Amino acid sequence: MPGYSDYIIRNASGLIPMVIEQTSRGERSYDIYSRLLKERIIFLLGEVEDHMANLVVAQLLFLESENPEKDISLYINSPGGVVTAGLAIYDTMQFIKPDVSTLCIGQAASAAALLLCAGAEGKRFCLPNSRVMIHQPLGGYRGQATDIEIHARETLAVRERLNNIMAKHTKKTPDQIMRDTERDNFMSATQAMEYGLIDKVLYDRQVAGHSTDL
């Protein structure tokens, strides 16, 4: 990587690599994710929950403010998680002006699969050995019978909303999405492309429009 040292160091936690940038003013260190953010790459890694969603939303808004015309790349490796957290990211992706290109590395399951298919049309990708899984939202409730009934109605309403969103991005009917998500539905990268969740399986960096210069 031009302009960078040939090694990485690790921060105090020993978990996140640091890169050293050589500039005319000396050296400057970044954690690897901050450095990639400069290239308009956001990582969605691990469980989708409120804290992670807030970080992703903040990065999307920041990159829009930096350049509202340039694409943003969202790299996904996630088992899914909280529906409301996933929808917060989804709504922000649709709200901001830049196109958001999505790329599955590893897995995109549940809410993460929804975010994968919500990328800009023609800019949704999987690496060849990625796995994608779609299913209906999960819920388990305890308490008074009336409260359980309220939560059950909410779960059904959320399911209908998610089916409509996925139908929009896959060009399938909500009824078909409902049938296909009745149980955990695992797909290979090629199957996800055939289903309409992504546009292409990437085997190398040849696709234009993705941040491929690192």
From Swiss-Prot:
Subcellular location: Cytoplasm
Cellular compartments per GO CC: cytoplasm; endopeptidase Clp complex
Pfam family, one: CLP_protease
GO BP, sorted A to Z: protein quality control for misfolded or incompletely synthesized proteins
EC number per UniProt: 3.4.21.92
UniProt keyword Membrane, yes or no: no
Keywords: Cytoplasm, Hydrolase, Protease, Serine protease
Reactions catalysed according to its record: Hydrolysis of proteins to small peptides in the presence of ATP and magnesium. alpha-casein is the usual test substrate. In the absence of ATP, only oligopeptides shorter than five residues are hydrolyzed (such as succinyl-Leu-Tyr-|-NHMec, and Leu-Tyr-Leu-|-Tyr-Trp, in which cleavage of the -Tyr-|-Leu- and -Tyr-|-Trp bonds also occurs)
Enzyme class: hydrolase
List of catalytic residues: 110 (nucleophile), 135
Known function: Cleaves peptides in various proteins in a process that requires ATP hydrolysis. Has a chymotrypsin-like activity. Plays a major role in the degradation of misfolded proteins.
Family under the similarity heading: Belongs to the peptidase S14 family.
The protein's name in its UniProt record: ATP-dependent Clp protease proteolytic subunit
